[in-house]
Amino acid sequence: AMLAPEPVISYPPELPVSAARDEIARAIRDHQVVIVAGATGSGKTTQLPKILLELGRGVRGRIGHTQPRRLAARTVAERIAEEIGSPLGETVGWKVRFTDEVGDKTLVKLMTDGVLLAEVQRDRMLRQYDTIIIDEAHERSLNIDFLLGYLARLLPRRPDLKLVITSATIDVDRIAKHFSGHSQHQDGHSGGDDGDGAQVPVVEVSGRTYPVEVRYRPVIDPDDPEADPDRDQT
């Protein structure tokens, strides 16, 4: 087990996800796979790792937390570290291509989905982790689709591994069906024909705290030397 100082955890009361934290924690405790659905701005990205830490996750293995973009991996790591009062790179670290700010004490590891995909090539069982969060699963990138498919097959072989998926509400049913029959209830029964064990709980977090404006970047020529490197998914 990795040793790290016990982080001090509190939840900003203005975030919609804070009101749902007991329901989320109960679902994670009782199920191997949980889906948290809600709009951008609900706080799920920053608060889920803290809920998991309170449940004792991240000790036998790290909490791996994927983001679709490199910039998000860093800024989310910074935010969580600030909220638990820990320097970045200690309890909370981040890893993207060419940058690795993860230490021996790291319990929560932010990364792009491309980084986790590369780690699958080297460690098929993902032994480094006791929990995986796939954030923004509705983005439906090739990386995310491959990871979800791979994890669905891995979970029966790693009954100790928990998977939390976040998504916009629109895509929840598709994702839940994808994992029905692949996960286990806390009592050890697998899904399939075993009734309730196959059901993946969906916790809906309603509302958003901050107004979110969606802006679309212009298409960038990949041969353009001035192209934005943040578009590289890994």
Sequence positions of predicted segments:
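P-loop NTPase motor module signature
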Residues: 1-234
